[in-house]
């Protein structure tokens, strides 16, 4: 697989001849320097972008061949996303933000809010469901965003620097929560991170450098 960006008359090759597999149930970290293409790779794997060349397969499904509508349906059905910034809707409560993906799917409000409360409890914020994002700390906002990502019960969690905007102590809390939910709900998780101590705790580590991907032993990373 390759990804090329055009800048004027110049082609910028982000990566090429990239090939790897992620197995069901694995927790995989994607690491690399800033600008190495980590987030772009996650976007391609999550059917938010297309490779310039090659294919991405989800089981037998060729993601690069999906129409925009089919890709959106695939993401809604199979994937949950967490970003560095929480992207919570400020005018809605934590409970309402978490319930939103289910309401968009057409689930009734009562059922959606019942499921949202379950996930509020899972992230330790059941007593904060009536608060709006501006009334929550950064760590609490990110935990709500994680609950929103998982409320649809996706098979795969995709996280792009989920602890990047948090202080060390809060980042540890959020990463531990991701790891527990990964295990408890038998997720497959892809986590872009610059935190090598967190990457070390994943099952596998994929490193991007100079347009090339290679796999490194997690225990070889600094603790």
Swiss-Prot record:
GO molecular function annotations of the record: ATP binding; ATP hydrolysis activity; transmembrane transporter activity
Keyword terms, alphabetized: ATP-binding, Cell inner membrane, Cell membrane, Membrane, Nucleotide-binding, Translocase, Transport
Domain ABC transporter span(s) in chain numbering: 1-223
E.C. designation(s): 7.6.2.-
Annotated PROSITE patterns: ABC_TRANSPORTER_1 (PS00211), ABC_TRANSPORTER_2 (PS50893), LOLD (PS51244)
Gene Ontology CC: one annotated term: plasma membrane
Subcellular compartments: Cell inner membrane
Membrane topology: Peripheral membrane protein
Keyword ATP-binding recorded: yes
Residues where ATP binds: 32-39
Record Pfam families: ABC_tran (PF00005)
UniProt key word Cell wall biogenesis/degradation: no
Subunit text: The complex is composed of two ATP-binding proteins (LolD) and two transmembrane proteins (LolC and LolE).
Summary of the function given for this chain in its UniProt record: Part of the ABC transporter complex LolCDE involved in the translocation of mature outer membrane-directed lipoproteins, from the inner membrane to the periplasmic chaperone, LolA. Responsible for the formation of the LolA-lipoprotein complex in an ATP-dependent manner.
Family to which this protein belongs: Belongs to the ABC transporter superfamily. Lipoprotein translocase (TC 3.A.1.125) family.
Name by which UniProt lists this protein: Lipoprotein-releasing system ATP-binding protein LolD
Annotated organism of origin: Koribacter versatilis (strain Ellin345)
């Amino acid at each position: 697989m390759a990804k090329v960006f055009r800048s004027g008359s110049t082609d910028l090759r982000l990566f090429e001849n990239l090939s790897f597999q992620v197995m069901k149930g694995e927790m995989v970290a994607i690491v690399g320097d800033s600008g190495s293409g980590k987030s772009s790779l996650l976007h391609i794997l999550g059917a938010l972008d297309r490779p310039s060349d090659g294919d991405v397969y989800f089981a037998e499904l060729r993601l690069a061949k999906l129409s925009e509508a089919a890709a959106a349906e695939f993401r809604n059905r199979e994937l949950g996303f967490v970003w560095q910034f929480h992207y919570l809707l400020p005018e809605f409560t934590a409970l309402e933000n978490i319930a939103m993906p289910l309401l968009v799917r057409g689930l009734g409000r009562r059922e959606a809010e019942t499921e949202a409360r379950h996930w509020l409890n899972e992230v330790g914020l059941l007593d904060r469901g009536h608060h709006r994002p501006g009334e929550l700390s950064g760590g609490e906002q990110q935990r709500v965003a994680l609950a929103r990502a998982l409320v649809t019960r996706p098979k795969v969690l995709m996280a792009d620097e989920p602890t990047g905007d948090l202080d060390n102590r809060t980042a540890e809390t959020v990463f531990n929560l991701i790891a527990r939910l990964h295990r408890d709900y038998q997720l497959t998780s892809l986590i872009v991170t610059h935190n090598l101590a967190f990457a070390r705790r994943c099952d596998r580590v994929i490193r991007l450098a100079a347009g090339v991907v290679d796999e490194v032993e997690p225990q070889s990373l600094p603790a």
